[in-house]
């Protein structure tokens, strides 16, 4: 068996933080294989050309891989399979990234699901196969093919000085992911339903980065959640619902791939969203809108590569509604800054917030970041952790933000905290007027 990983055209297009985090995952996986007496062969180039070349070099008779469902990956995998089969090579892909293949889940009329709740109800009692255990050893070939060095790829180049800031918040590898899952099921899941909406609480599983990079299987998480449910642990069903929300994203991106690039609801194509990097958009990206909940969330993402889910909803609503800026601006910024970036989940989340997606929040639901702060961060622990300006003794994580951002931004913790770029009440009314007149 010759394990191979290819830095191909799809991965080359990843944003700074996801690409860097993927490099960590690949490097760690290479170490795991080495411990099993194997090697990870690294190549760079177009997947179909690299694989066909490796087959010729090694005399391999079969190529196997795990399926993905975003449009670019589907196109790539289709081309690879056709080329290999054309050369008489067995080419097979397998389902390992999701609980159910998107085409196996159908409505009663044979279509695909467009609303989450019936999608959840159709799956919650379905049998999910258990994840296969990792092999203890892999039979090595007589001769190993040449391999690139991952250090030469410099997958973290675009991170600049931010990499050393984000690194302590990363949890790399299967063993670490399994440990995180075990701790969550054993200690955290009972309080999950209540704590998951409070960004200052350590109330979520934090498994999203590991799921994204294949370091733990959704099936493994599902079976752990089901065991917790059968043991009567409060919060277990909510955890399972979140896994199915991830599944819903893949279901939609497969059946309607436009969701990653354009409005899922075509009637939103004429909506007058701003599409430029205006000063207000720049303030949003930099966490300097003058709205503490929004700014804390954006800074959390820049320092840790994570953002709490409640905070994601608030910053997305603020950008698309209070600032009337296109959701694709936010989608692209998240794609550059998140270590758990996932094309399907990212697109679904942004279009849900903007109102342009399937099962989206109604246009008149405009999150008020001030009342959200009172509700979910009443003691201000979250904003105090991430905002340094005006604090006599700023939290170290708030100060880390100024060490992580590009020097060209010219930011300092001694700066005055900015005034709001838009009045919250006026921004809400402007959004409602625009939606009602669209």
PLM region descriptions:
Residues 6-8, 45, 68-70, 96-97, ...:
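An acidic- and aromatic-residue-enriched active-site/binding cleft used to recognize and process polar
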Residues 21, 25, 173, 289, ...:
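Soluble or luminal CAZymes and related metallo-dependent hydrolases
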């Amino acid at each position: 068996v010759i394990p191979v990983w290819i830095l191909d055209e799809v991965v080359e297009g990843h944003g700074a933080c996801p690409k860097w985090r993927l490099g960590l995952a690949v490097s760690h996986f290479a170490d795991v294989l080495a411990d099993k007496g194997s090697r990870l062969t690294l190549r760079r180039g177009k997947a179909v050309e690299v694989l066909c070349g490796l087959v010729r070099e090694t005399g391999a008779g079969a190529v196997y891989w795990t399926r993905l469902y975003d449009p670019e990956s589907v196109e790539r995998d289709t081309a690879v399979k056709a080329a290999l089969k054309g050369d008489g090579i067995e080419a097979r892909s397998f389902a390992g990234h999701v609980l159910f293949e998107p085409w196996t889940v159908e409505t009663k009329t044979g279509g695909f699901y467009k609303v989450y709740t019936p999608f959840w109800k159709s799956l919650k009692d379905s049998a999910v196969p258990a994840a296969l255990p990792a092999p203890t050893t892999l039979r090595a070939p007589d001769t190993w093919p040449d391999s690139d060095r991952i250090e030469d790829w410099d997958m973290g180049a675009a991170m600049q000085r931010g990499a050393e800031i984000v690194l302590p918040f990363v949890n790399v590898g299967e063993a670490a992911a399994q440990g995180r899952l075990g701790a969550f099921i054993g200690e955290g899941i009972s309080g999950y339903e209540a704590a998951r909406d409070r960004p200052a609480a350590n109330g979520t599983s934090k498994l999203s980065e590991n799921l994204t990079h294949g370091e733990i299987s959704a099936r493994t998480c599902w079976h752990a959640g089901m065991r917790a449910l059968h043991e009567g642990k409060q919060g277990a069903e909510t955890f399972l619902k979140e896994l199915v929300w991830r599944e819903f994203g893949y279901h939609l991106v497969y059946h309607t791939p436009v969701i990653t690039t354009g409005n899922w609801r075509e009637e939103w194509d004429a909506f007058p969203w701003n599409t430029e990097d205006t000063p207000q958009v720049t303030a949003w990206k930099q966490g300097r809108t003058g709205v503490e909940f929004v700014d804390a969330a954006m800074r959390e993402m820049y320092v840790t590569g994570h953002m709490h889910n409640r905070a994601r909803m608030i910053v997305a609503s603020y950008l698309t509604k209070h600032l009337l800026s296109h959701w694709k601006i936010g989608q692209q910024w998240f794609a550059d800054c998140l270590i758990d970036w996932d094309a399907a989940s990212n697109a679904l989340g942004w279009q849900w917030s903007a109102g342009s997606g399937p099962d989206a929040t109604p246009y008149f639901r405009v999150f008020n970041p001030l009342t959200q702060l009172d509700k979910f961060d009443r003691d201000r622990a979250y904003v105090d952790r991430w905002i340094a300006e005006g604090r006599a003794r700023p939290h170290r994580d708030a100060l880390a933000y100024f060490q992580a951002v590009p020097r060209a931004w010219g930011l300092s913790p001694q700066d005055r905290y900015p005034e709001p770029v838009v009045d919250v009440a006026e921004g809400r009314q402007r959004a409602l007027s625009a939606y009602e007149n669209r």
